[in-house]
Amino acid sequence: MIKNLLLYLLIFSCGNIIGQTKPLSEEAEISLLTCSPGEAIYELFGHTAIRVKDPRQGLDLVFNYGIFDFDTPNFVVKFIRGKLLYKLGIDQYRRFEYQYVAQNRRVVEQVFNFNLNEKQTVFNYLLYNAKPKNAYYQYDFFYDNCSSRVFDILIDTLGQNLTFDIPEKNYLSYRQQLDYYIDGNTYPKSPWADFGMDLILGMPADEIADFEGETYLPDLLSQNFTFGILRNSDGLVQSNSVIVPQKKTSNIVNFRITPLLLFWTLCGLTSFLFFVKNNTFTKSLDFILFLFLGLSGVLFTFMWMGTDHEVCYKNLNILWMSPFHILLAINILRDNINDFWKKYLGFTLVVNVLLILFWTILPQDFHAAAFPIILLICMRIVALIKKTE
């Protein structure tokens, strides 16, 4: 009862704030909050929010572009197809802070070096866009998310008053940036998440993310804001501090099976099947292999052609995970490898061999664990062709 009452009061108070433009005092501060990654898959790259604090007015709010409504009709379908709308939400800072303390996730605050007019302009912009008719937007992982939106807000509100001393460096592709984070360079490794993302992301992920493009990652947005210049002289960031520290946890990593270890092991074991005469065993293995590849191909084809997820378009992984492998698997189970399927096997073998030969110059970076899988496919195709001769 008390919890529901507090929630109602929070919603009511935030609703009152949205409905009116409050003049900020000279003591007001607007800052960027950069949150470290969490354990859930959707928390792997951290989070970004904007804090508006004005002690004289009794304001301490967090504006968050990472909100979506689980009660949305057909939520799961819309989420999968990339049609789910995200929105800008407002919360009291204390509630926001409590959440990250409970999850043991660090929060870094960068206070912007705004004058009063700039503070008011940004605050008014946020309030206007938090209104129900303006709050929703079409989320895009690379090009329009909770982090990149903050960059856009400052560009839109400050105009020519904000410039950047863009550093000269070798910019990475979107995929390389994701790999850098997931591979444990900054946070604990997530090898299976890394493998899954490399499989589902298409060629757009291999485009170079420039200074503005890389702001889709909260840490890089925070870093790039340090190169901001206000009114041709002052730095954009006035101060930088950790407001929610992260407690140290054990760095001991227990042995675990990674995609690379698993698939190289399977590839090695499969090589011995050339000497196995048990037709039932090898037939079952080939059926499972090509059925799994085919079903994966159906998923990736759907993500490319049936959704609005642009990052999944033009996925070359379909070359070795063809949806047609499902039909091949069925015919393997039926012992029906006729002339058509022999030609299909030959064509598939050529495609997979070419992928291996041109691995380093393909327009899409494949995950290293895909190499032993493709090698395994080649071995089983050769075995199938030999068996049908």
Language-model segments: which ranges?
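Internal catalytic domains of large membrane-associated glycosyltransferases
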Residues: 20-25, 32, 134-136
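Alpha-helical membrane-anchoring segments
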Residues: 21-24, 41, 250
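Activation targets extended, charge/polar-rich intrinsically disordered C-terminal tails
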Residues: 128-325, 329-330, 337-341, 349-389
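Short, charged, amphipathic alpha-helices and their helix-cap/turn boundaries
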Residues: 117-126
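Bacterial Sec-dependent N-terminal signal peptides
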Residues: 1-21, 388-389
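Glycine-rich catalytic cores of cysteine/serine-nucleophile enzymes that process amide/ester linkages
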Residues: 26-104
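Second-shell loop/turn segments in exported
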Residues: 38-39, 105-113, 132-141
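A short, structured loop/turn motif at beta-sheet edges
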Residues: 21, 54-59, 113-118
